[in-house]
């Protein structure tokens, strides 16, 4: 379980329409619901959803940040707002990264919040959320699990596909890439695949569809000894996993 998730759930129990959690925390929540293990994760990645009563949510959010004693960094660009909250005290998530693509609106940083420096390499998520295809895909896959707003497994999988492909391309271009992150995203696709209901069909378009095709092509070309799903306790090998992905998305 993610440290601090209980305080998060309690604070935002009436506001699940205003955010969606993705990334490792979403994986942890979804797999825990299915009584499956997941690696330890301390951070919450969340996307703001701008509804009519958003200022009410914003007030509650800042209460939580102050109660948790967080420091805050932010980068506001023309189309994307990014916030990073760090060093939450005991009982609160270690870090919260928050994204919004609402044009002309951002969370007003309140007094009493200690600022931190944010480097230029914030997150690949910023780029993906600027894409209308991925944003609409995310909006169509939101659900509530145990009082927390998350992206459902069948919609989270293409985000993990994108993350793996993005790191793979950067590595091929000669950039330094954390091999643990590369491995993590590769396997998260199949971890989540375990809990997608049999017979599920998911529609996508544009860049989402392109990335799904690209992932299937790339993962199929990897030596099967490097995609050891059965050894990790999954109920299928790489080839069967790829077949299931095709049945769901293509």
Task: Kindly label every feature range from the protein language model.
Residues 1-250:
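Compositionally biased terminal segments of proteins
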